[in-house]
């Protein structure tokens, strides 16, 4: 009888400072192990008390990444999906809010049989249960070889302690030979002395050891290469094998990180330590990606007109989907961050958008900056600039075309104006109690993957290459069906709807009116992969490239025109 395969656990922690790139490090390691033929899944443990990031300010948290099954998760889950090239579920993100809610609910039901409910063992047991779920077979019945779990926050944070203790207990439960602790730390460079300093990393590792965790390997983040003697010093002072000290200086692209970690031998070291099957990394797919990243044959400039552009992480999946769309055409996408407020006037929109090859209107919430988004759409529509609207972007496209083409000057959304003379965008039927405050706001939007039917021959159908698609959603408002006929007569094409025809999913202008003017109620950026660009983004970038090429074409001026010009 064959011996049951043991699932390996890799825990990724961070020290010294936040925003070191733990998520990208973990994702890159996952990509390397996947390229070695291993089945990898990933999880993020977030120490904040929010149940999920769905109600958090984008300026504080960045984007909310929505999974296929409708979970609102941390943006690192997006990194995991893009690097692993696989869909994850709601189990991939665990927060303190979820853990405490579950434990308190059990206590109220009497499941603890009168025990005093404590952080240890009740909270830690709940965290361990969430970690164990990741080791179970997926919907296809396949069990992972490796579960990579990233612990959010920084070692030393009070709120991280229960999660770190749970990880320590998992090592005890499954055996030390089946666990690997990877610690990401900062090695700062002090310009006055001209030195890289190891003391912060030593203190960070000491803090980990104080709670019973000895890291097996260290990823040392720095703005420059680490000398070998410095790596040997870190290995000695932190009690880590020399092969386990990995230098990870800043890379030109996030997609270079797997190559950097591989060149330092991290994946080979981990495979040996965990006794995993040793196969060479297959670079065929990722190598082709890096070739497209670093050797573009063309460039294209896209304006991203948003409300949260001061924090680019608020649009992380959008920017990566745009870049991936460029990779599909061996083009480098240069993103111009345009605050939507600057486009409220015609002159402001012209100043911000002239010279752009494409305009993207991303999602968002609230009335601030909406007139600027409408101004940007108006400029792009009237100047024939390829335009893509996502979620709120579609709604703004509908409002703008209703005002400009259908003669509904007071057209608006009930999100921004209530009551509204022409509510071309209205609250979804099952969302009225949320808007009125009678139901919780968190986790109640239309979330997750939903199917759509596309009109054959439409721009979106040709982009997808099919007429039945499914995309992820996150919204409370929709196109008001009572205005669909009037908008259609004005020239707006409803090129995709829900299978029952009730919900508008895609709109566009005909090709004879505009080269590419497409909006979707969905968030297609969430399904884009660097190695498999989303077809809608690939089509948008292609339209931008064609627009750029047309702008550069020489213009023939007839002799009569030249003569009349000369005589003026």
Curated annotation (Swiss-Prot):
Residues the record lists as binding Mg(2+): 76, 150
Binding site for CTP: 18, 157-159, 197-202, 233
A molecular function (GO) term: identical protein binding
GO CC term, one of those recorded: cytosol
Subunit text: Homotetramer.
Keyword field: ATP-binding, Glutamine amidotransferase, Ligase, Magnesium, Metal-binding, Nucleotide-binding, Pyrimidine biosynthesis
Broad class of enzyme this protein falls into: ligase
Family note: Belongs to the CTP synthase family.
EC number(s) given by UniProt: 6.3.4.2
Catalytic reaction(s) noted: UTP + L-glutamine + ATP + H2O = CTP + L-glutamate + ADP + phosphate + 2 H(+); L-glutamine + H2O = L-glutamate + NH4(+); UTP + NH4(+) + ATP = CTP + ADP + phosphate + 2 H(+)
UniProt miscellaneous comment: CTPSs have evolved a hybrid strategy for distinguishing between UTP and CTP. The overlapping regions of the product feedback inhibitory and substrate sites recognize a common feature in both compounds, the triphosphate moiety. To differentiate isosteric substrate and product pyrimidine rings, an additional pocket far from the expected kinase/ligase catalytic site, specifically recognizes the cytosine and ribose portions of the product inhibitor.
Binding site for UTP: 18, 197-202, 233
Protein name: CTP synthase
Binding site for ATP: 19-24, 76
Active site (UniProt): 391, 523, 525
CDD domains: CTPS_N, GATase1_CTP_Synthase
Span list, region Amidoligase domain: 1-276
Regulation: Allosterically activated by GTP, when glutamine is the substrate; GTP has no effect on the reaction when ammonia is the substrate. The allosteric effector GTP functions by stabilizing the protein conformation that binds the tetrahedral intermediate(s) formed during glutamine hydrolysis. Inhibited by the product CTP, via allosteric rather than competitive inhibition.
Domain Glutamine amidotransferase type-1: from-to ranges: 301-550
Xref: InterPro entries: Class_I_gatase-like, CTP_synthase, CTP_synthase_N, GATASE, GATase1_CTP_Synthase, P-loop_NTPase
UniProt entry tagged with the keyword Transcription regulation: no
Species whose genome carries this gene: Saccharopolyspora erythraea (strain ATCC 11635 / DSM 40517 / JCM 4748 / NBRC 13426 / NCIMB 8594 / NRRL 2338)
Function: Catalyzes the ATP-dependent amination of UTP to CTP with either L-glutamine or ammonia as the source of nitrogen. Regulates intracellular CTP levels through interactions with the four ribonucleotide triphosphates.
PROSITE patterns: GATASE_TYPE_1 (PS51273)
One BP term from GO: pyrimidine nucleobase biosynthetic process
Protein's pathway: Pyrimidine metabolism; CTP biosynthesis via de novo pathway; CTP from UDP: step 2/2
